[in-house]
Amino acid sequence: EEVISRLKQENAEIIFVNQEQSEIPGTFWRFLVIDDESVDKFMIRDADSLISYKEKAAVKEWLNSGKYFHVMRDSRMHNELILAGMWGGYNGVIKNMFGLMKDYLKEDMDVNRISDQVFLRKRIWKTVIQSVLVHDSYHLGKEGKPYPDYEISDIEKIAFFHIGMIDSNSCTIKTEIEIKAKKVKWYLENENGEIICSYDSFIKKENGKQIIEINLPTFYSSKIKSNKWKISYEVLE
């Protein structure tokens, strides 16, 4: 509910799946945009992936290419034909995506964390390959081409940067809570005292101390380590 509330504050459109749609695995729900007749073009991304100038340049090149679909691979770990959170296309080419997903799941009952990508390989790639721009840093397939030049941001200078990276996995900040509590609202403040973000967290016990663990993007955590930014909090429970 908190996430939905935050999205609404940023004027995001929230679409709830219906009862029938909710019966397929949640990782497949994002593909339902392909059945939305109000959508002209779609880009499907993981909710926790980092948006970058490199991705922006790649998408711009796709939009100017005349191709119906766009696929990106940017890591040695990106070894599927279509990464479930790194592709896009024009609507109207793939028909009845929900039906395709239901039929596939009836045949393949072994649902796991990569089932969505296996579905894309087995059922969708044969359509996508007919008109696709593939950006591929490691040339998984002959259809891949290099990424265009792009503006370099600070985050794109780190050694492990790639499109689709989950940047908040790279650093966990532990903050001691000195007041006895069960739950706090913490704030990330910059050098000017401005609030960058704020979330609720439950207290954990570690070595006799009360702490909260916060996963932050590399850029944010580096600011804390250099004592330029700080974490403050208020007790909720």
Model-inferred region functions:
Residues 27, 31, 56, 116-118:
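Conserved glycosyltransferase catalytic-site signature
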Residues 76-79, 89-231:
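Catalytic core and acceptor-binding pocket of nucleotide-sugar-dependent glycosyltransferases
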Residues 39, 66-67, 181:
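Short, high-confidence coil segments that cap the C-terminus of an alpha-helix
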Residues 2-41:
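Active-site-proximal specificity loops/subdomain of glycosyltransferases
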Residues 51-82:
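Conserved donor-nucleotide/metal-binding helix-loop-beta segment in metal-dependent transferases, i.e.
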Residues 33, 69-71, 86-88, 119:
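Conserved hydrophobic/aromatic beta-strand scaffold that supports enzyme active sites
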Residues 47-49:
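Short acidic donor-binding/metal-coordinating loop in glycosyltransferase active sites
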